[in-house]
């Protein structure tokens, strides 16, 4: 199994480390590689889009010729996991909490609506215990300038919710082999969400 991590920004090497731990836990012979160029997409069984700044990631991926071939591969069935900014990149519709509709380079492959900066800026970062469909027990979510998943249309569905300032919003969603999270599972040391996604990859 060969999993790529989009390598422009954010928790790239944290995801590589978590993948290696997850391969060991699942007893899978796997390789985690960093993706920066179109040729790095060859032979992948799945791809992770990490956190960071979604506009910057999208612009770099487009400028370096990765965005369009990656979109084509995902539409043809390549499993993908997006965390925080990565969830924005996967989303079909994106708004900003302050300025409204956003025009930015996206994959746009999941039928979800995401609101950028929903939980505030860096200084409003927080952690919360989450219930996630498919996981036993709670999962500690790390939210850093995180988006919220405010809507999902079939075949996408929200698998984790959070009550925030009196509003119930989605913080994780799946659509076939695609997984989007508002939070940063790579910062927790808990491999269960990576395990959940790799099981989708193996199907």
Swiss-Prot record:
Could you give a GO molecular-function term held by this entry? pyridoxal 5'-phosphate synthase (glutamine hydrolysing) activity
Task: List, from the UniProt record, the residues annotated as the active site of this protein.
Answer: 84, 184, 186
Output a single Gene Ontology CC term carried by this record. glutaminase complex
Please give the coiled-coil regions recorded for this protein.
Answer: none
Q: Which UniProt keywords apply?
A: Glutamine amidotransferase, Hydrolase, Lyase, Pyridoxal phosphate
Provide the residue positions that the database annotates as binding L-glutamine: 52-54, 116, 144-145
Any S-S bridges, and between which cysteines?
none
Could you mention a single GO BP entry for this protein?
Answer: pyridoxal phosphate biosynthetic process
InterPro entries, per the entry: Class_I_gatase-like (IPR029062), PdxT/SNO (IPR002161), PdxT/SNO_CS (IPR021196)
What is catalysed by this protein?
aldehydo-D-ribose 5-phosphate + D-glyceraldehyde 3-phosphate + L-glutamine = pyridoxal 5'-phosphate + L-glutamate + phosphate + 3 H2O + H(+); L-glutamine + H2O = L-glutamate + NH4(+)
Q: What is its EC number?
A: 4.3.3.6, 3.5.1.2
Query: Can the keyword Hydrolase be found in this entry's annotation?
Result: yes
- Tell me where on the tree of life, at the top rank, the source sits: Archaea
Gene3D superfamilies (alphabetical): 3.40.50.880
Instruction: Provide an example Pfam family for this protein.
Output: SNO
Q: In which pathway does it act?
A: Cofactor biosynthesis; pyridoxal 5'-phosphate biosynthesis
Summarize subunit and interaction data from the UniProt record for this chain.
In the presence of PdxS, forms a dodecamer of heterodimers. Only shows activity in the heterodimer.
Family from the record: Belongs to the glutaminase PdxT/SNO family.
Briefly state the protein's biological role: Catalyzes the hydrolysis of glutamine to glutamate and ammonia as part of the biosynthesis of pyridoxal 5'-phosphate. The resulting ammonia molecule is channeled to the active site of PdxS.
Protein known as:
Pyridoxal 5'-phosphate synthase subunit PdxT
């Amino acid at each position: 199994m060969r999993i790529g991590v989009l390598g422009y920004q954010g928790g790239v090497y944290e995801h590589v480390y978590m993948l290696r731990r997850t391969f060991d836990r699942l007893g899978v012979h796997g390789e985690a590689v960093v993706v920066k160029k179109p040729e790095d997409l060859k032979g992948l069984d799945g791809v992770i889009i990490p956190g960071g700044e979604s506009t910057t990631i999208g612009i770099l991926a487009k400028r370096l010729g990765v965005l369009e071939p990656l979109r084509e591969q995902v539409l043809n069935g390549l499993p993908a996991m997006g965390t925080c900014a990565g969830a924005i990149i996967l989303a079909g519709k994106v708004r900003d909490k302050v300025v409204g509709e956003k025009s930015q380079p996206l994959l746009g492959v999941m039928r979800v609506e995401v609101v950028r900066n929903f939980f505030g800026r860096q200084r409003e970062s927080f952690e919360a215990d989450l219930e996630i469909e498919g996981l036993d027990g709670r999962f500690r979510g790390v939210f850093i300038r995180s988006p919220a998943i405010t809507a999902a249309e079939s075949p996408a569905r929200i698998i984790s919710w959070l009550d925030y300032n009196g509003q119930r919003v989605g913080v994780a969603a799946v659509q076939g082999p695609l997984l989007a999270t508002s939070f940063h599972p790579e910062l927790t040391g808990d491999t269960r969400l990576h395990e959940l996604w790799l099981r989708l990859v193996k199907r």
